[in-house]
């Protein structure tokens, strides 16, 4: 079982002959834990980004898909934008050095970049598909069929753990402080991401369409997106 915040694992794995199921998901919600930032004061809204360079952690990924959809909704042709692959930890420096005009980054690096002088242009996932999944944990269909009890336990633990920490953000931050090297001032300011379940079938259909539309897969997705979904009872 694995998580996928980069390439759209559902449609690409299905395309490559490896049927998988989506067990839990990370929604794009009001928290805005993924955002497009810039150091350039002339870039203040999505419509300003035509003809610019935008850093993403992985090319041909969920990141480029979501930013492209967000740009297109704002009237910007994504083909006029150059996506540049930059590791998340290097994005702030890439903006500072002028290597890129903007960056699509994630917490806690988002808050660190804001402290370093960047400003938010927008939150592509939350702005375009609020409350919809953009990452998740996946398992092969064979594993799902062979290990229903384990999958049910994993799903229960994920959901209950998430509900617990979201009800107590101070404890959530204490756990992050214990298990990560995030500076205390960043922990205090950062937006806390949340897992949720179940996932909606419509976002799987949307992502399947967008992976083809923006060139991640060479042909339209032919499978049934609902077959990518599986949520254990309990």
Language-model-derived ranges and their functions:
Residues 1-74, 85, 101, 120-123, ...:
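Short, glycine-/small- and polar/acidic-enriched structural segments
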Residues 8, 84, 89-175:
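Pocket-lining segment of extracytoplasmic ligand-binding domains
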Residues 28-29, 126-129, 194-202, 222-223:
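Short, solvent-exposed loop/beta-turn-alpha elements that line the ligand-binding surface or hinge
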Residues 40-48, 76-78, 142-151:
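Short helix-loop capping/hinge motifs at secondary-structure junctions, enriched
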Residues 73-79, 216:
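Short helix-capping segments at alpha-helix termini
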Residues 145-218:
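Secondary-structure end/capping motifs
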Residues 212-234:
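Conserved C-terminal helix/tail region of periplasmic/extracytoplasmic solute-binding proteins
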């Amino acid at each position: 079982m694995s998580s996928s915040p980069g390439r759209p694992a559902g449609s690409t794995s299905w395309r490559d002959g490896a049927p998988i199921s989506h067990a839990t998901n990370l929604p794009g919600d009001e928290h805005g834990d993924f955002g497009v930032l810039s150091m350039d004061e002339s870039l203040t809204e999505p419509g300003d980004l035509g003809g610019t360079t935008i850093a993403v952690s992985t090319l041909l990924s969920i990141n480029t898909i979501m930013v492209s959809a967000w740009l297109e909704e704002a009237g910007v042709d994504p083909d006029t934008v150059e996506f540049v692959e930059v590791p998340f930890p290097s994005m702030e420096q890439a903006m500072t050095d002028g290597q890129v005009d903007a960056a699509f980054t994630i917490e806690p690096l988002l808050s660190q970049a804001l402290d370093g002088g960047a400003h938010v242009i927008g939150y592509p996932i939350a702005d375009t598909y609020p409350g919809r999944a953009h990452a998740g944990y996946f398992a092969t269909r064979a594993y799902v069929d062979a290990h229903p009890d384990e999958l049910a336990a994993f799903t229960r633990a994920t959901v209950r753990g998430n509900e617990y920490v979201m009800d107590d953000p101070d404890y959530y931050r204490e756990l992050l402080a214990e298990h990560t090297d995030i500076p205390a001032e960043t922990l205090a300011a950062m937006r806390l991401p949340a897992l949720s379940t179940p996932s909606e079938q419509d976002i799987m259909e949307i992502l399947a369409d967008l992976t083809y539309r923006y060139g991640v897969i060479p042909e339209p997705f032919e499978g049934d997106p609902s077959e990518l979904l599986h949520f254990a009872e309990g």
